[in-house]
Structures are given as C-alpha cells and as structure tokens.
C-alpha cells in the first residue's frame, strides 16, 4: 500500500530549486531538489553518514533520481536559522556564540575527516534547534578535497563568507570552512561582518581574527584547534 505524502510548505531557499516540508504518516522531512552535478558528492556524503554519526549536521535520509530530477530527503529540524535570529532578535549572548560555534566545529570536523568541505557556512545554513543545538544544513555545494588539484573548478559560496581561495586561485580545503566559521562567529557575536566590528571579548576577537586571515596558511589548521580555544573561553559553570 502506497503511503500518502502531504506537502505542508514551500521553504525559503537561496536557489530557485524545489525545497518543501513534507509529512508522511506522521513523519516530517524536507525534500530538496539538487543538480545532476551535486548528486555524486551528496550521495557520497549520505553513504558516509550511514557509516558514522555526524554531530551537528542535518541527517540525509535518502538521495534519489525521479523523472530526470535529483532530490534529497533530509531531517527537518524545528528551530530558527542564525539569519532569522539576527534579524528578529539581534546578536547572541557570548555563551550562546561559544556553545553554537563548538557544535559547528564538531560538524565541520566530521566533514573534514571524510575529506569533504561544506563551502557555504553562513547564517542561513545554520539552524538552532528548539533544544538549543546548532546544526549545519544545506550541503548543496559540498566538495571532495582532491589531491594534486591546484584550484577549484567553480567559483561557489556566499560573498562575505567565501574564503579567497574559493574564487579559483587555489584549491579550497578545511581552512576554507574555517574562514567562513570565523565570519559566522563574528556575525553571531556582533551582528556585523569582521571588517565592520569585532567581538568585545578579547579571546573571541582573537579566534575570529585568526580564522579569517586572507592567507590560508595563517588560519587554524583544523576545527579541533578552534574547539579547544572556544572551550577555554566558556565559563566553567556553563552546562
């Protein structure tokens, strides 16, 4: 017996491709249309998720082709995006910034462990759940890091969050996501881009500055380093 799907809402998206909230027998998920070019790497991402847990990353339930179009069904996380929070309520508290950034470090470290980079870590692509956890969503421009490739074949990413190497001069790697994470931390703390204002907290300011160095060589090597620095800033009595 075929189960019935109900489309509950068309969701806002940065692309013109289909994104909708679906209910099926009491189960809710998000269906997104992806391109033929995105399909192989997102399929690989899905297979990695089946093999090992991925903290702070939206779960992909299925990746498939139907009538010449490609789709993913992914977890629906109840909450609001960082972008929505900044628009409606302004910057986050320092403790919130640190906790959410630590969540994202764990998620990005998972990507990087599997030789993948997200390449679009922005306020619109981070959801704060009702349980107050941060999740990376929309792995639409995921990329596998390829050995011996000197530059990216396509210029992708959100202006302001895209690291210089994403503009085709050198190959992007884990430090590309680190650059975007630094910009995101700054946005959460101040509501502004780093060139406009930096966090008041000296240690947070130092983290943002190192993450967003123009030269990838001067940034943190990995997200674990950032996680440890953030943990040192977090008050001891914070759960």
PLM feature spans:
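Conserved HxN/HPN-centered segment at the entrance to the catalytic loop
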Residues: 53-62
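Conserved short submotifs of the Hanks-type protein kinase catalytic core
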Residues: 67-81
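Catalytic-loop of the protein kinase fold
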Residues: 112-128
């Amino acid at each position: 017996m075929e189960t019935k799907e109900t489309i509950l809402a068309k969701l806002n998206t940065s692309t013109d491709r289909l994104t909708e909230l679906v209910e099926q027998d009491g189960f809710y998920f998000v269906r997104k249309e992806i391109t033929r070019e995105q399909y192989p790497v997102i399929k690989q991402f899905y297979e990695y998720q089946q093999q090992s847990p991925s903290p702070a990353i939206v779960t992909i339930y299925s990746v498939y082709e139907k009538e010449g179009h490609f789709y993913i069904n992914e977890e629906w996380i109840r909450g609001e995006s960082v972008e929505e929070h900044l628009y409606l309520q302004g910057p986050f508290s320092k403790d919130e910034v640190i906790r959410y950034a630590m969540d994202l470090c764990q998620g990005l470290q998972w990507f990087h462990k599997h030789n993948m980079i997200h390449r679009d870590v922005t306020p619109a692509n981070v959801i704060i759940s009702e349980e107050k956890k941060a999740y990376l969503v929309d792995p639409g421009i995921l990329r596998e890091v390829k050995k011996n490739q000197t530059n990216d074949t396509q210029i992708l990413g959100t202006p302001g969050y895209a690291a210089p190497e994403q503009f085709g001069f050198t190959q992007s790697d884990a430090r590309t996501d680190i650059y975007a994470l630094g910009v995101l931390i700054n946005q959460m703390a101040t509501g502004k881009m780093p060139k406009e204002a930096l966090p008041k907290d000296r240690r947070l300011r130092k983290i943002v500055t190192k993450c967003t160095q123009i030269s990838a060589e001067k940034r943190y090597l990995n997200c674990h380093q950032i996680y440890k620095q953030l943990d040192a800033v977090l008050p001891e009595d914070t759960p």
